[in-house]
Amino acid sequence: MAEAATLCHIDAVSDNFLFVEGRERPYLIDWEYAGVSDPLIDIAMFAIYADYREEETEQLIAAYFPEGFDALARARIHTYMAVGGLLWYDWSVYKSSLGVTFGPYEESQFRFAKEYAVKARKEWEML
């Protein structure tokens, strides 16, 4: 069963985490894209912004769920990674049409969209 919707940052790029000496937890800034959503979306967005490969993504999920996680959580995260990759790929293509280029970022986001769409579909079929 899905978790209740909650406030999500949705732009969990590493530049939006401010670490302050003497403070245990970082500050999270730039709430421009924030909204009420599935909390797992922030894990997915962090992974694609950090250009994590599969092993790193699995380590991130395991760190978020130290008590363990189920196949449904993984399928949801991978689905958000596919959709997020497509969103940011489309955004990059649009910005390129305006003369703003992002180099390998565009290709990286397309890769996330393709790879994680296949992965998520297989996971949903297994549920």
For the regions a language model picked out, list residue spans one by one.
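Generic anion/oxyanion-binding catalytic loop in active/binding sites
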Residues: 2, 32, 46-49, 78
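Short, surface-exposed, polar/charged, turn-prone segments marking secondary-structure boundaries
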Residues: 36, 54-58, 116-120
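Active-site activation/catalytic loop segments of kinase-like enzymes and analogous catalytic loops
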Residues: 40-69, 82-100, 112
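Juxtamembrane loop-transmembrane helix junctions in multi-pass integral membrane proteins
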Residues: 69-75
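Start-of-helix signal in alpha-solenoid helical-repeat scaffolds, especially tetratricopeptide repeats
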Residues: 75, 79-83
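ATP/Mg2+ or Mg2+-diphosphate-binding catalytic cores
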Residues: 90-127
